[in-house]
Amino acid sequence: MGKRGKQRRKDRRGPNKSKAQLPYKSNSAKDFYKFQEQLKQSNLAMQEVKADGNCLFRAIADQLDGNQHNHDMYRQNIVEYIKQCEDDFAPFVEDDVDFETYVKNMKDDAEWGGQIELTACSRLYSVNIVIYHLDAPTYVIKNEAGKGSDTIKLSYHDGEHYNSVRNVCDIDSGEPVCKYKIINPLREKENGDTLRDDDGSGGEWQLSAAQIKLLLEKPS
């Protein structure tokens, strides 16, 4: 995953930039096995995703769609949301890059995502996010919408890789883990039409900049 200067940028974590605040351990084969055993105690297991710089978005896609195919769609939607919410996210972009450049870079395939993208994902898709670490407390991003939000579960490895986390019985099932609710401004009705039905089907929606702008302007 080390192309296009990502070594310099890989630790972007928004309000939690320091490694002490977002801990990780070396991802040797021994540690990977230990991590799996740690998750197994909670009836969980890792659904591994490809380590190609898109791992965060692949893991999100696995949670929401049941597979990794639409990872770029999730990347583009999340980054567009960040762009539309510049006042919220710009303060957490590293000082060596301006916000416009950050957004432009993050739209690129294989650009590493981190804390900013996780927070945007939680807000855009109305989900909580739990991130598991080896021998460390879980890291939780609670959705601001409050009650009723479903939860994305991820594992974080060696400070540079995310995997999807599923119940043991759901590994390789191809079924979505987490149901999200996001209003489609172009289809919205009084009863609240959504991009995804509660049966977990969907995944075909890519939001335009105009749609996300409408979403942000819609009264809650």
Question: What does each model-found stretch correspond to?
Answer:
Residues 1-48, 193-220:
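Non-catalytic, low-structured ubiquitin/UBL-interacting segments
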Residues 4-11, 104, 121, 159, ...:
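Non-transmembrane, interaction-prone segments in cytosolic or luminal domains
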Residues 11-16, 20, 31-38, 66, ...:
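Aromatic-enriched hydrophobic runs in primary sequence
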Residues 24-42, 47-143:
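Papain-like cysteine protease catalytic cores
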Residues 109, 114-219:
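Deubiquitinase catalytic domains
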